[in-house]
C-alpha cells in the first residue's frame, strides 16, 4: 500500500497466524530482493478498538507511530470489510489509540495526538535544527534549495548525532513555498534512507513552521518527495490535529517465507 508514496506491506493478521521475526520483516521490506517497502504492518484484533496496527520499520524492528502507515491501515481495514463501531475508526498503535475516518475514495484523515518536546537552537554540525515529537521524533531544518540537497548524507549525519539525539531521530528538511504551504524531504530512522513521504514528519513540519511563524495558516499543504500533497490541520493549541491524504492499495500478492 502507498500513503502518498510512503509504501507498506500490510497483512491481515486478525487470526494471529503470523509471528514474524525481525529478519523476516527486513527481508520482506528489502527492495530488489524482497517485496520492498518502508515498513510492514500487521493488522490485528483489539479488545478496546476496531483493530491494532502492529508496525515494523524496514530494518525489521518495531517502530514508533507511523502517520502514513496508520492511514494505510485504516484504508486496508475499510477494504477488508472492517467498519468503525463509532463515528470514526479507532485503532491501537503502540501504547496509544488513534481515530481516523475515510473521507473519500482512497483518502483517509488521521487524528494525531498532541506533540511534545519542542526544542529550538540545536546545532547539528553545520545545521541549525529544531525538534518535536509527533508520535515519532523529528529534527527539522529549513533550506532554500530543497531540490538540490543531499538528503541521504546530510540527514544521515543529523540522524546519528548521538549528543543531540541519543536514540536517533528522523530528519526533515523544509522549504516554505507560501503562507500556507511548504515542501519537505525526510530521512527516516529505521528505513535509514530518504522516503517519498513521512506522515509524522509532515505533521511535525506543519506544526513547527506555524509555531515559528514561517506559515500563518492552521491548514497547511505539504508537498512530499513523491510529488503528492498531504494536508495538516490543527487548532491554535495544537491539541486537535489531523493528517489527511491519499492511501492506496497498489497490489495484492502472496509470499513464501
UniProtKB/Swiss-Prot annotation:
Substrate binds at residues 6, 57, 67-68, 170, 188-189, 199-200. The keyword Cytoplasm applies. One of its GO terms (biological process) is lysine biosynthetic process via diaminopimelate. PROSITE patterns: DAP_EPIMERASE. GO terms for cellular component: cytosol. Belongs to the diaminopimelate epimerase family. Catalyzes the stereoinversion of LL-2,6-diaminopimelate (L,L-DAP) to meso-diaminopimelate (meso-DAP), a precursor of L-lysine and an essential component of the bacterial peptidoglycan. Keywords: Amino-acid biosynthesis, Cytoplasm, Isomerase, Lysine biosynthesis. It is an enzyme of class 5 (isomerase). InterPro entries: DAP_epimerase_AS, DAP_epimerase_DapF. The record marks 138, 188 as: Could be important to modulate the pK values of the two catalytic cysteine residues. This is Diaminopimelate epimerase. GO terms for molecular function: diaminopimelate epimerase activity. The keyword Cytoplasm applies. Pathway: Amino-acid biosynthesis; L-lysine biosynthesis via DAP pathway; DL-2,6-diaminopimelate from LL-2,6-diaminopimelate: step 1/1. Homodimer. Its main location: cytoplasm. The active site is at residues 66, 198. It catalyses: (2S,6S)-2,6-diaminopimelate = meso-2,6-diaminopimelate. Its EC number is 5.1.1.7. It is found in: Cytoplasm.
